[in-house]
Amino acid sequence: MSIEERVKKIIVEQLGVKEDDVKPEASFIEDLGADSLDTVELVMALEEEFDIEIPDEEAEKITTVQSAIDYVQNNQ
């Protein structure tokens, strides 16, 4: 499974959204209905899945599906 597919799978599981709604430009809060706690849990799930550390200042910048994919790809 590609990084993109794994990130999308985590988003679907964490936010309880349909896979069809997880588009690259989708904002976690505005488009996918996440709140700030959801986004923290999402970052924690990404850290666990990809065995990476995401500092708070970087986590704040991860606001869309594509930004999550890009971050993981650049920090693997």
From Swiss-Prot:
<dbReference type="GO" id="GO:0000035">
    <property type="term" value="F:acyl binding"/>
</dbReference>
<keyword id="KW-0443">Lipid metabolism</keyword>
<dbReference type="InterPro" id="IPR036736">
    <property type="entry name" value="ACP-like_sf"/>
</dbReference>
<keyword id="KW-0597">Phosphoprotein</keyword>
<dbReference type="InterPro" id="IPR003231">
    <property type="entry name" value="ACP"/>
</dbReference>
<dbReference type="GO" id="GO:0016020">
    <property type="term" value="C:membrane"/>
</dbReference>
<dbReference type="GO" id="GO:0000036">
    <property type="term" value="F:acyl carrier activity"/>
</dbReference>
<comment type="function">
    <text>Carrier of the growing fatty acid chain in fatty acid biosynthesis.</text>
</comment>
<dbReference type="Pfam" id="PF00550">
    <property type="entry name" value="PP-binding"/>
</dbReference>
<dbReference type="GO" id="GO:0005829">
    <property type="term" value="C:cytosol"/>
</dbReference>
<keyword id="KW-0276">Fatty acid metabolism</keyword>
<keyword id="KW-0963">Cytoplasm</keyword>
<protein>
    <recommendedName>
        <fullName>Acyl carrier protein</fullName>
    </recommendedName>
</protein>
<feature type="modified residue" description="O-(pantetheine 4'-phosphoryl)serine">
    <location>
        <position position="36"/>
    </location>
</feature>
<keyword id="KW-0444">Lipid biosynthesis</keyword>
<dbReference type="InterPro" id="IPR009081">
    <property type="entry name" value="PP-bd_ACP"/>
</dbReference>
<comment type="pathway">
    <text>Lipid metabolism; fatty acid biosynthesis.</text>
</comment>
<comment type="similarity">
    <text>Belongs to the acyl carrier protein (ACP) family.</text>
</comment>
<keyword id="KW-0596">Phosphopantetheine</keyword>
<keyword id="KW-0275">Fatty acid biosynthesis</keyword>
<dbReference type="GO" id="GO:0009245">
    <property type="term" value="P:lipid A biosynthetic process"/>
</dbReference>
<feature type="domain" description="Carrier">
    <location>
        <begin position="1"/>
        <end position="76"/>
    </location>
</feature>
<dbReference type="InterPro" id="IPR006162">
    <property type="entry name" value="Ppantetheine_attach_site"/>
</dbReference>
